[in-house]
Amino acid sequence: MSEPANERTGFHRVLLKLGGEMFGGGKVGLDPDVVTKVAEQIAEVVRSGVQVAVVIGGGNFFRGAELQQRGLDRARSDYMGMLGTVMNCLALQDFLEKEGIDSRVQTAITMGQVAEPYIPLRAQRHLEKGRVVIFGAGMGMPYFSTDTTAAQRALEIGAEVVLMAKAVDGVFTADPNLDPTATMYAQITHREVIEQGLKVADATAFSLCMDNEMPIMVFNLLTEGNIARAVSGEKIGTLVKS
C-alpha cells in the first residue's frame, strides 16, 4: 500500500525535469508561449532564493525509440534526440535571460561554441551564484532517457528532489486519459511505481532514485504557478519517496 501523504517542506536546490513535448505545445518545434511561461515560473522561483537546475527532453524534435521503429539505428537516432534537447536548452536560456535570470547551458556532448561541457563542480558553483544550470544532450550516450539523466544529474549536483513536470496532475493508478476511474496518489514509493508498472517515467530513473533515496515530485506543468508550489512544498501532484 502507498503511504499517506506527510507534511511537505520547501526545497533549497532542485532538479526540474521538463518534457520536450510540452516545449512544442504538442507539435514539432518550439512554442514560444509555452517556453515563456516556463521561464517566468523558473524566474519566480530563482528570485525567491532557490537553486534550480533543469533537464529538458527533446521529444518535440526527435524521439530515438520511435525513430528506431521506423528503421533508423537506435544509437544514431538517440544522438539526434540529444541534439534536440540542446535546441530546447538554448531556447530556455534565451527566455530566462529576458526575465533577467543568469543561466548556463552544460552539455554532455562537447559543443564549445554554444555551451559549457558538463562539469558537476562547475554546475554547483553556478547554482551557488544564483544561476540556472540547464543540462543538455542527455547523458551523452545512447539508450539512456532524459528521465534517467535527470535522476543522475540530481544526485551528482546534490539536489534535494527531482521535480518531474508532466502534462498530468501526478501519478495515477491507471492512465486517466483511458480510464475514468483512475485515481491519483498523494504519495507512493519508488518500488511501488516500478512493481505496478506505472508509466510516469522509465524504470531506470525510478530505480536510480530509489537506490539513492532521491525523492521525485510529479506534478502538472500546465497549471500556472505549479513550479513555485512544488518548490515550496505545497501538496500538489504526487510525492514519490522510499
From Swiss-Prot:
The residues that hold ATP are: 17-20, 59, 63, 172, 175
Return the SUPFAM superfamilies for the record: Carbamate kinase-like
Q: Which domain of life is it from?
A: Bacteria
Q: Where in the cell is it found?
A: Cytoplasm
Metabolic or biological pathway: Pyrimidine metabolism; CTP biosynthesis via de novo pathway; UDP from UMP (UMPK route): step 1/1
Q: What is its EC number?
A: 2.7.4.22
GO cellular component terms, alphabetically, are: cytoplasm
Keyword check for Secreted: no
Which residues does the annotation say bind UMP? 58, 78, 139-146
Question: What are the GO MF terms of this UniProt record?
Answer: ATP binding; UMP kinase activity
Catalytic activities: UMP + ATP = UDP + ADP
Task: Please state how the activity of this protein is regulated.
Answer: Inhibited by UTP.
GO annotation, biological process = 'de novo' CTP biosynthetic process; UDP biosynthetic process
Q: Which UniProt keywords apply?
A: ATP-binding, Cytoplasm, Kinase, Nucleotide-binding, Pyrimidine biosynthesis, Transferase
Q: Which family does it belong to?
A: Belongs to the UMP kinase family.
**Its function?**
Catalyzes the reversible phosphorylation of UMP to UDP.
Instruction: Outline the subunit composition.
Output: Homohexamer.
Q: Which PANTHER family match?
A: URIDYLATE KINASE, URIDYLATE KINASE PUMPKIN, CHLOROPLASTIC
Q: Which HAMAP family match?
A: PyrH_B
State what protein this is by name. Uridylate kinase
What species is this protein from?
A: Rhodococcus jostii (strain RHA1)
